[in-house]
Amino acid sequence: MEAVHCFRCYKFPSKQIEFYLTNCMHMFCIECERLCHPPEEEPLKCIQCSKTPIRIVKMGPELPMTIKSMFTPISEEINQYTRDLTRVLTFQHRQRASLSTFLERKVAAFDRLRDAYSEEKTKKEHYKKQLEEAYHLLKSKEHEISKLKKQLAEQAPPPQTPPRSNSLKVASSRSLETPSMMRVFSDSMYETPVQIQRRFTKAQAKAEAEAEAPAKSPGSKAQTTKCTSNYQSHPPASFETPIHHPPKTSMGFTTPANPPHMFPYLKKHEAQREKHKEHRNSQ
C-alpha cells in the first residue's frame, strides 16, 4: 500500500524504519511512537487524537489477518470479492437449474397423469352406461320369460298318469329273469370240470322231467318263480365248459386267487372224489 506513512512526520516505511499502529487507527514511526509514552506512569496516549488509553501494535508479518486486510490493495480486494461472488453465483445458479429441471419433469408427469385420469374417467362413464343398459335389458328379458312361462302354464292341459302297459310288466319280468353276468362268470370260473358235468347232467334230467310233466298255465306265479330260479341257477351256453371234451389235468381253479402251486392238491382232491363216486356206484 503506497499511502502508508507516519501521521506526525509523514515518513514512509522502509526496512530501517519500524512503524506502529494504534487501536485508534493512527500510524507512527518508531520515533513518533516514543512520544506516545508519557514520562510518568500514565496510560499510553495518542499524540494525534489524544485518546487514552490506547494499544500499540508493531507492523510486520505477525499482524492479525483482520489488520492485514486493511493494508491489502483495493484492486486485489475487488478481484477476490469478484471471484468469491462468481463462485457463489455459480453455485446458486446450479441449484436453481437443478430444482427447475426437477419441477419441469414433475409438471410433465402430472400432465400425463391428468390426461390418463381424464381418459379413464371417460371410459368408466361409458362402461357404467353400458352396464346400466345391459341391466335394464336383462330385467326386461326376465320379465318376458316369466310372462311366457305363466302363459304356458295357463294353456297347458292338466297332467294325466298313463296306465302301466303290459310291455313294461313283461320287460320287468324279463329283467328279473336275466341272470347276472358277473355271477355266471364267477360260478363257471370257480367250478371244476367234474362239478360242471354233474350240474349239467342234473339240469338235463330236470328239463326232461319237466317236459314230460303236464304243462301249467302261463299266468301261474309259482311256475314263473320256479322257472326264474332254475334259469338263474344255470349260466348261458357261451359260459359253460364243453362236456364232450375230456377234462385236462391242468383244468381246475386256474384263477389269480388259485395259483399253479395249488394244482397238485386239486388233482389229489379230484382223484379222491372220483374214487368215492366209483365206490358208491359199485354199491
From Swiss-Prot:
Residues 149-175, 201-283 are annotated as: Disordered. It is found in: Chromosome. The keyword rRNA-binding does not apply. It comes from Caenorhabditis elegans. Residues 267-283 have a biased composition (Basic and acidic residues). Residues 202-216 have a biased composition (Low complexity). One of its GO terms (molecular function) is zinc ion binding. InterPro entries: Zip3/RNF212-like (IPR042123). This is Zip homologous protein 4. Interacts with zhp-3; the interaction is required for their localization along paired chromosomes and stability, and for the formation of chiasma during meiotic recombination. Keywords: Chromosome, DNA recombination, Meiosis, Metal-binding, Zinc, Zinc-finger.
